[in-house]
Amino acid sequence: MMLYFFDPVYMMLAVLGYFVMLLLASTIAPKVASRVSGKFSLFTSMVLLAGMILAISAAIIYLILAYAGVYISFYGLIIFLLIINLLMYLLSPYIINLSYGAQRDERLQMVVNSVARRLNVKPPKAVVVRSPPNAFAYGNFLTGKFVAVSESLMRMLSQEELEAVIGHEIGHHKHRDNAVMLLFGLLPSVIFYLGYALLHSSMRDDRRGAQLAAIGIAAVIVSFIVQILVLAFSRLREYYADFEGVRATNKDAMQRSLAKIHLFYHRYPDYLAPIQDSKFRTLFIYAFTNAVAEPITRADIEALKNMKVSPIQEFLSTHPPLPKRLRFIESIRVF
């Protein structure tokens, strides 16, 4: 990646892409979201969004292959990105275990087993980690599945609240979110680097240079649009995991657990930095979007549900903002 730092083409594309993302997140995305909000169920929304991501990605990749011809080793790029991401997928559980000092815990395992039975899934391995209050799910077919909970979070939550958090994390395993988001996360990268390669190719082609450059720039812009859609898809998966937390316990327990974590980081902001800077922050149950309230009582939670959310913060985040999560949990009907 250091080579790209000195590449003016790469830097130009990166700046262009981030400008596109900010424009989408601040103007277009909120308007589109407001129009479709509430019109579809959570599952239908995920299916439609996944279909849109795949359709847009397939269309731009087909366009590049159809018009770029032999200028890009497309399959070589795909294989390279797949290998890199597969290695990260396989090695990340070992890295997480070392980074956070993960240790098996029998008491936590009993809670995980109980919640897993309610959700009709095989219980993952329960580990306690050294970190500020948080929880996350990780693992693969080699290491097995893990649910990690920090010692501080275990002390902070009641038994029922802890079960709600664990239900959320088991939900990620149940929905295969790690693998799903790995695959969807590849698409923006593939499109971006195809566009980047096309722009370089255009400089060496006097006959088709302008055409290749135009397609390359379009591909880069589309890659950031797809990235916005992938982030939206990730937020829907978080809602889906919250649904499992409610199924495992109840709405109030799920809301209280999120509110307690929220309150901790508002009172002790110094603990935010190591979580926000972590390479694994997308795994955490709590993401730090618009964290300013102090929910202690039910009235505090009700007030938090009605807080305004920054569109840019929301649309550039992998997790929904807390007010929207609380409102979603309130709307859940479990049969």
UniProtKB/Swiss-Prot annotation:
Statement: the UniProt record of this protein carries the keyword Cell wall biogenesis/degradation: no
Record EC number: 3.4.24.-
InterPro entries: HtpX_protease, Pept_M48_protease_HtpX, Peptidase_M48
Membrane topology, from the record: Multi-pass membrane protein
Binding note for cofactor: Binds 1 zinc ion per subunit.
Main location as per UniProt: membrane
GO cellular component: plasma membrane
Names of required cofactors: Zn(2+)
Similarity comment: family membership: Belongs to the peptidase M48B family.
Protein name (record): Protease HtpX homolog
Organism: Archaeoglobus fulgidus (strain ATCC 49558 / DSM 4304 / JCM 9628 / NBRC 100126 / VC-16)
Gene coding for it: htpX
